[in-house]
Amino acid sequence: HGASRLLDYGARRRDKDRAVPVLFVPSLVNRSYILDLSKRRSLMRWLASNGLRPLLMDWGSPGDDERGFDLDAYITQRLEPALDAARQLTGGPVTVAGYCMGGLLALALALRRPQGVQALALLATPWEFHGTGDAHSHLLSAMGPSLDGLLSLFGELPIDVLQALFTWSDPSMVSNKFRAFAAMDSHSQRAE
């Protein structure tokens, strides 16, 4: 469907018909490969080698089909068909796992289609949206017209704008992250 696709990390297993499918929903902001960084650093591959059949929703880059999509459209036109495909593998409900913002999308999917979801796992999913204070709210309100203008011009928010918004939410986050990377032994397993 559009730029989105469902990646099956258990399709090559000899026992794929017996492996338990789990539909993974990443954030719309991060690419799906955050859950499959490399052959040695991959949650999807590790789960596949340990008896599960991970199905990863890859949003791709928004194309013409996705221009103007809101969250409802991503849930109804992308996630619901992915859930249907996952259910075809088992003939019944499946586990759905959401990562970061994908957890909110997975939760919405589970609420819309409870008969299709056996279990729900939420990983690093934001849940507190009221603790940012009045200063953040006022600034976001003031930025609204500019963001609307960018959406009208590009049809989506450019990734640099999204990154700036995330950085703005915690200005020290980026410098702390790179300071920690710089302090690591570059040959250590953690640095991989």
Task: Indicate where each model-derived feature is located.
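Short helix-loop-beta connector
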Residues: T90-P93
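Gly/Ala-rich beta-loop-alpha elbow adjacent to hydrolase catalytic centers
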Residues: A97-G102, A106
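Alpha/beta-hydrolase-fold enzymes
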Residues: L105-E192
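Alpha/beta-hydrolase active-site loop
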Residues: G68-Q88
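Conserved catalytic-core motifs of eukaryotic protein kinase domains, centered on the activation segment
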Residues: E66-G68, G133
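Short, surface-exposed "cap/lid" segments of acyl-processing enzymes
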Residues: H1-G63
